Design a protein with these regions (language model features):
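Active-site/ligand-binding-proximal alpha/beta "capping" segment
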Residues: 138-139, 145-188, 194
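Conserved N-terminal beta1-alpha1 strand-loop-helix module at the mouth
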Residues: 1-87, 93-95, 102-104, 109-110, ...
Length: 219
């Protein structure tokens, strides 16, 4: 709890220039980065496509959060990029178990994302197999949403199904709530606008990381 929580910058854009700029900024200080990819069907808008990413830089863990209605359409590009973790949504139109199987055979960790209206107990078969569960508490395809901290109640339900699973949070994380999220025993806090908007991104990242290490209300 707290000291085990990592802050992960997220990149969400449909502009390749912005993608490159944010990538350059974040790899200078972050140990792990999440790239959000959207198909324009599961989400209201599209992101830069996986095919536009020639390769992922070495020395940093990359997570791909694929917001797509048909995960199988994106699997070949994910396997080509070989990220640390690939996250697909439980609400997709396809069974994720064959996708997870192919990811694991390729040495890629498998993650399942859960929208706010999805009860974790209904996707037990995915949680039992996945390496990572992403509690999505924002608006699909957008950064800067207000965090719904009540979604963190899903942590204990997920842990009751698979105690050792890594749990991530995506949606509205900022300096005012990362301590609370860390104290809910969220392992990974993905941060969008609270890092992309400040001019000094490294300082913002360090402040978030320090806050996430604190325990309780006053410490």
């Amino acid at each position: 709890m707290g000291e085990d929580t990592i802050i992960v910058p997220t990149i969400l854009t449909d502009d390749t220039n912005v993608f490159v700029e944010q990538m350059k900024a974040y790899i200078a200080f972050a140990k792990r980065i999440q790239i959000d990819l959207m198909d324009g069907t599961f989400t209201p808008n599209r992101s830069v496509p996986e095919s536009s990413i020639s390769q992922l830089p070495n020395g940093i863990q990359f997570d791909l959060h694929i917001m797509a209605i048909r995960p199988s359409d994106h699997l070949s590009e994910v396997l080509r990029l070989r990220p640390h973790l690939a996250i697909f949504h439980a609400e997709a139109s396809e069974d994720l178990l064959p996708i997870f199987d192919q990811l694991k055979k390729a040495g890629i960790r498998a993650g399942v994302a859960i929208l706010p209206t999805t009860y974790p107990g209904l996707i037990k078969k995915y949680l039992e197999v996945a390496d990572h569960a992403l509690i999505f508490a924002g608006n699909l395809g957008q950064q800067g949403a207000k965090a719904d901290i009540l979604q963190a109640e899903k942590v204990k339900i997920i842990r009751s199904i698979k105690p050792d699973i890594e749990i991530g949070w995506d949606g509205g994380a900022n300096l005012t709530n990362v301590r609370a999220l860390a104290n809910y025993e969220v392992n990974v806090i993905n941060v969008g606008s609270a890092l992309s908007q400040p001019e000094d991104k490294k300082a913002a990242y360090e402040a978030l990381a320090a806050e996430a290490k604190k325990r309780g209300v006053f410490l």
